[in-house]
C-alpha cells in the first residue's frame, strides 16, 4: 500500500518510467497497481538476482526507493526478518552505492509506535 502511494505521487508529478519491485504473493496487493502508470514490474527476489548478474543491464536508474522491509510488529520469524529486512536491504544498498544511485530507505511506524509516548528509539522487536 505504501509503495503504491509513492508511485501514485510520482505519477502525479508526471513520472511514469518506474520499475516496481515487490513480492505480490497470493493476496490482492496487485490491485493497488491497476490504476498506476509504470514501465514494468519485477519480483523482488528476481530483481536482487539480476543486480548480481547483470546490474548495469537493468537500465538507467535515477533513484531507488526501498520500502520492502517487513514492518509487522507481530512477525516472529527471525530468519525471515534478517533475510528480508537486513540482508536484502544491505545487498540492495551496496549495489546502489557501487553505482552511485540515490538510495532512499523508508523507516516505519514500528520504530516509533503510535506516537502517544513521543519518540522512543528503544527496540521492542527485531524489526524496530
PLM regions: where:
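Conserved SAM-binding loop
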Residues: 93
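NAD(P)H-binding glycine-rich loop region in Rossmannoid oxidoreductase-like domains
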Residues: 44-45, 50-84, 113
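A short helix->loop->beta-strand "cap" motif at the edges of active sites that frequently abuts
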Residues: 15, 98-101
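SDR active-site strand-loop-helix element
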Residues: 21, 64-68, 103-109
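N-terminal Rossmann/SDR dinucleotide-binding element
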Residues: 1-63
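Catalytic nucleophile-elbow at a beta strand-turn-alpha helix junction centered on a G-D-S/GDSL motif
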Residues: 1, 109-111
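Alpha/beta-hydrolase active-site loop signature
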Residues: 25, 71-72, 88, 110
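Catalytic helix-loop patch of NAD(P)-dependent Rossmann-fold dehydrogenases
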Residues: 83, 87-90, 98, 111-128
Amino acid at each position: 500500500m505504501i509503495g503504491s502511494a509513492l508511485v501514485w505521487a510520482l505519477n502525479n508529478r508526471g513520472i511514469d518510467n518506474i520499475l516496481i519491485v515487490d513480492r505480490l504473493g497470493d493476496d490482492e496487493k496487485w490491485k493497488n497497481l491497476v490504476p498506476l502508470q509504470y514501465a514494468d514490474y519485477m519480483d523482488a527476489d528476481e530483481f536482487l538476482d539480476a543486480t548480481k548478474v547483470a546490474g548495469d543491464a537493468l537500465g538507467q536508474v535515477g533513484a531507488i526507493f526501498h520500502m520492502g522491509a517487513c514492518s509487522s510488529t507481530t512477525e516472529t520469524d527471525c530468519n525471515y526478518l534478517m533475510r528480508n529486512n537486513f540482508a536484502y536491504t544491505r545487498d540492495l544498498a551496496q549495489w546502489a552505492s557501487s553505482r552511485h544511485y540515490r538510495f532512499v530507505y523508508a523507516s516505519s511506524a514500528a520504530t516509533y509506535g503510535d506516537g502517544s509516548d513521543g519518540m522512543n528509539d528503544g527496540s521492542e522487536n527485531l524489526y524496530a
